[in-house]
Amino acid sequence: MFGEKIDNWVDHPIIKPSISCVAMTYSLAQNPEYEELMTATSHLTGKKINRFTHIHQSTEDLKNKVKMQRLLGQKTASCFQRCVGMDAFNAVYSTTYEIDEKYGTHYHENFKKFLIYVQDNDLTVDGAMTDPKGDRSKAPHDQRDKDMFVRIKERREDGIVVRGAKVHQTGSINSHWHIVMPTQAMGEADKDFAVSFACPSDAEGLFMIYGRQSCDTRKLEEGADVDLGNAKFGGQEALV
């Protein structure tokens, strides 16, 4: 940052507020006062899990989701970074089921195994959706630079190789895993771009370019607490 390597990013005054936000999703779940709102029972394992890893089963679940988000908003007044991942779980869960029903594939079972792993370990997962897009008047396959949308570069027996980027990824640096999803509806000609997958944050070939926040250097100034505003919590994003 500013041309210097940061060895202790956990306590860095620009970076720490973002870490504190996602940490709140864990600490409140351990607090008996908020435990009922912050946790749920997994329909896959029957275990108590963080609500951010839950697949909604009822209207009560949906209401509790909103109440949980309001609570965290009151506690942090900032983005707590697990909402898109939670929505991604629910979207991919139902979509993979419908795909398997139609095409006889096994994506749903694959995803359930991954979700159980996430639930058992209470992982933070970044929902990575927004592509750079390039020329927005053109479909992905018509882009001059095909890497403006995440795409399958190579298909192998053991999986796929992908290229591209996701932008404006709030909290991705604080996430254990990423779920990559298409950013828009795709046609047949865009089939290489119609891909969704999960990968760990330390996967080989995955890079994150740290994105700072407006006026974040104010946190470095002496006596800034006079008008700093939200000193303990804040945001960050990355180009992934």
Predicted regions and their residues:
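N-terminal-proximal low-complexity accessory segments that begin disordered
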Residues: 1-26
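Acidic, aromatic-enriched beta-alpha/helix-loop junctions
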Residues: 20-35, 192-198
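Generic structural signal for well-ordered, non-transmembrane alpha-helical segments
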Residues: 16, 20, 116-119, 161
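Short active-site-adjacent helix-start/loop capping segments
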Residues: 8-9, 45-47, 135-138
